């Protein structure tokens, strides 16, 4: 999982990527290709 300052590029990397907010942090999850997972500080 990458820690990024901006998730704009992360959510457009793959069409299955979704932006989700958990525990006050913002995550990008991708079920079909999990190496695109990312989180924002």
Curated annotation (Swiss-Prot):
Assigned keywords, A-Z: Ribonucleoprotein, Ribosomal protein
Superkingdom of origin: Bacteria
Pfam families: Ribosomal_L36
Protein name: Large ribosomal subunit protein bL36
Database matches in SUPFAM superfamilies: Ribosomal protein L36
Lineage: Bacteria, Pseudomonadati, Pseudomonadota, Gammaproteobacteria, Lysobacterales
Ribonucleoprotein among keywords: yes
PROSITE patterns named among the record's database cross-references: RIBOSOMAL_L36
Residue ranges crossing the lipid bilayer per the database entry: none
Molecular function GO terms recorded: structural constituent of ribosome
Alphabetized HAMAP family for the sequence: Ribosomal_bL36
Keyword Ribonucleoprotein: yes
Family, per entry: Belongs to the bacterial ribosomal protein bL36 family.
A GO biological-process term: translation
Source species: Xylella fastidiosa (strain M12)
GO CC aspect terms: ribonucleoprotein complex; ribosome
């Amino acid at each position: 999982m990458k820690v990024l300052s901006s998730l704009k590029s992360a959510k457009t990397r793959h069409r299955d990527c979704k932006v989700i907010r958990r525990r006050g942090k913002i995550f990008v999850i991708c079920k079909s290709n999990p190496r695109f997972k990312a989180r924002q500080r």
